[in-house]
């Protein structure tokens, strides 16, 4: 079972294509998208969890292999990957988990809370733009100690799209069409997300906590 972790603020085609490609590559029956509750690593305001959850549900609804989990949102407190995987293991004890995230995030995996346990809970898939190289010396050293299939890097051309760019375009009233599903574009517009001062009520403030996570 694939596990697609992220803030999804907002979700876009890069996320969806990455999940689809990983599912095909590893012959996965299902990919569960898990919007983070309170992502401790984000040094900016993030949209309220319910907005991010609903956008993810809307974006994935048409693919029968995709589903969305609330485990991180409903747990409360900062979101740590080890808790995400432990909860999903409890819910799906017979499934082998493939945790998918950005390759750039994996470069700092040794700073995540309980990182030593992570590779016992799941296989990791780092998705990246074509040409990306995992250069962090700590993760490069770690790779030599892991089983061959513990961590795989996969190039995804659609990852040239980023949530940061989508937010900036919305703030500048620039078009979001063809960067994300039409239904998500309409949701962003209807709820007035990412439009500067007008969306203060749609935001929740998170600060960098003294812990580790994704």
From Swiss-Prot:
A molecular-function term among this protein's GO annotations: ATP binding
Top-level taxonomic group: Bacteria
One GO process term, biological-process aspect: NAD biosynthetic process
Gene3D superfamilies: HUPs
Keyword tags: ATP-binding, NAD, Nucleotide-binding, Nucleotidyltransferase, Pyridine nucleotide biosynthesis, Transferase
Xref: InterPro entries: Cyt_trans-like, NadD/NMNAT, Rossmann-like_a/b/a_fold
Signal peptide: none
EC number: 2.7.7.18
The keyword Cytoplasm is assigned to this record: no
Keyword set includes Membrane: no
Catalytic activity: nicotinate beta-D-ribonucleotide + ATP + H(+) = deamido-NAD(+) + diphosphate
Pathway(s) of this molecule: Cofactor biosynthesis; NAD(+) biosynthesis; deamido-NAD(+) from nicotinate D-ribonucleotide: step 1/1
Role summary: Catalyzes the reversible adenylation of nicotinate mononucleotide (NaMN) to nicotinic acid adenine dinucleotide (NaAD).
Family membership: Belongs to the NadD family.
Name this protein carries in UniProt: Probable nicotinate-nucleotide adenylyltransferase
């Amino acid at each position: 079972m694939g596990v697609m972790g992220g803030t999804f603020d907002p979700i876009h085609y890069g996320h969806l294509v990455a999940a689809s490609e990983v599912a095909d590559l590893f012959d996965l029956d299902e990919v569960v998208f898990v919007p983070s509750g309170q992502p401790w690593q984000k040094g900016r305001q993030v949209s309220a969890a319910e907005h991010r959850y609903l956008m993810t549900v809307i974006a994935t609804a048409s693919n029968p292999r995709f589903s969305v989990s609330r485990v991180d949102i409903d747990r409360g407190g900062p979101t740590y990957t080890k808790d995400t995987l432990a909860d999903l293991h409890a819910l799906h004890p017979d499934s082998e988990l493939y945790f998918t995230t950005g390759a750039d995030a994996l470069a700092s995996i040794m700073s995540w809370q309980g990182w030593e346990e992570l590779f016992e809970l799941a296989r990791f898939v780092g998705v990246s733009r074509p040409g990306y190289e995992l250069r962090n010396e700590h993760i490069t050293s770690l790779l030599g100690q892991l089983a061959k299939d513990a961590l795989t890097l996969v190039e995804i051309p659609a990852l040239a799209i980023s949530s940061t760019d989508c937010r900036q375009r919305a703030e500048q009233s620039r078009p979001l069409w063809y960067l994300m599903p039409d239904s998500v574009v309409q949701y962003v517009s209807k709820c007035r997300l990412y439009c500067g001062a007008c969306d203060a009520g749609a935001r929740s403030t998170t600060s960098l906590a003294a812990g580790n996570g994704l």
